[in-house]
Amino acid sequence: NRPRLRANSDGVEIRNINGTRFYPWEVIYGMSFPEGSRMARIELPNFEYVPVWAIQSGDKEAAIAATRNFRELEAKYMPLD
């Protein structure tokens, strides 16, 4: 299966090479793409994170578009607290 990131009002589903996991918006602190990193990551509590293999720096414009799309959904659904 190909890596994938899907988000809706309930939360975010991430499929990486090691399986698929769902994270409700309440436990997500946002998405980051650290400088020099190969892929985006979803920030979780306690300084943990999940790599997002579906959004890689080598994909250039597609990665930028996917990150923008995620941030729009994040702004719409992620709790403010």
Predicted features along the sequence, with ranges:
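Conserved beta-hairpin
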Residues: 1-25
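Generic beta-strand structural signal
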Residues: 7, 33-35
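Short acidic, Gly/Pro-enriched loop/turn segments at secondary-structure junctions
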Residues: 35-42
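Bulky hydrophobic/aromatic packing residues
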Residues: 23-25, 39, 74
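A membrane-cytosol interface segment of integral membrane proteins
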Residues: 42-81
